[in-house]
Amino acid sequence: MGLLECCARCLVGAPFASLVATGLCFFGVALFCGCGHEALTGTEKLIETYFSKNYQDYEYLINVIHAFQYVIYGTASFFFLYGALLLAEGFYTTGAVRQIFGDYKTTICGKGLSATVTGGQKGRGSRGQHQAHSLERVRHCLGKWLGHPDKFVGITYALTVVWLLVFACSAVPVYIYFNTWTTCQSIAFPSKTSASIGSLCADARMYGVLPWNAFPGKVCGSNLLSICKTAEFQMTFHLFIAAFVGAAATLISLLTFMIAATYNFAVLKLMGRGTKF
């Protein structure tokens, strides 16, 4: 069997659910981390410019924002590696499942790839043997995890629960900014509300962003409307919305990964009891 034909047969048996979930995971994490990082920076500038002139009032908030930004760096790195590992697991276990059902034989493709990788090693001497030994060590390390979907089911389930909390927390700043924007709309169109314009305020202390002794801590009336019209406020609001969408996409990808891994684990457990892959 030629290499092209082998690749075509391997693509037929590709784990499309894992491929879609991986793309969605990378897209969601990139959107959440990138937009979330910039939105936190914009929030810091808005607070120190309009809501408090005393640095001690928002010093704790800045420390929290910087801590979250460092967590974002780690989250992006972790999900990139874990998503790639889940994709590799999807290819491995899907091949094992389809071998049980007889859809295609992975050993044929394996032989073709092996011939391609190891071909011509005799002429390369010790260098070729060293490369083959390195590849064998990588395969040995991955083999401890790949082919064991039960491990990935447990880890992915725990990550899904944790990310569900992250998804819920990402909705909080969207809610705060939406309330502020709604208040600005009421100020811009006084006919829609019976309250006086001067009594319509956005109070950062009410949401726990600033301590209650912060001054002024809130912005009211036409001053608030001027803040809502700034490009900085609009950009930060939309960045938080984008981060929320990214968190939702990542949650969907984790659920897809978990369903696919659970299915593969069930098939291998129930129908492949006497088979080793």
Curated annotation (Swiss-Prot):
Cellular component per GO, a single term: myelin sheath
Disulfide bridge positions per record: 184-228, 201-220
Homology family: Belongs to the myelin proteolipid protein family.
Membrane topology, from the record: Multi-pass membrane protein
PANTHER family: MYELIN PROTEOLIPID (PTHR11683), MYELIN PROTEOLIPID PROTEIN (PTHR11683:SF11)
Keyword Transmembrane: yes
Lipidation (S-palmitoyl cysteine): 6-7, 10, 109, 141
Record's function text: This is the major myelin protein from the central nervous system. It plays an important role in the formation or maintenance of the multilamellar structure of myelin.
Species in which this protein is naturally found: Macaca fascicularis (Crab-eating macaque)
Protein name according to UniProt: Myelin proteolipid protein
InterPro entries: Myelin_PLP, Myelin_PLP_CS
Keywords assigned by UniProt, alphabetized: Cell membrane, Disulfide bond, Lipoprotein, Membrane, Palmitate, Phosphoprotein, Transmembrane, Transmembrane helix
Cytoplasmic face of the membrane: 1-10, 89-151, 269-277
GO molecular function, one term: structural constituent of myelin sheath
Positions carrying Phosphoserine: 114
Any one biological process term the GO annotation gives: central nervous system myelination
Highest taxon of the lineage: Eukaryota
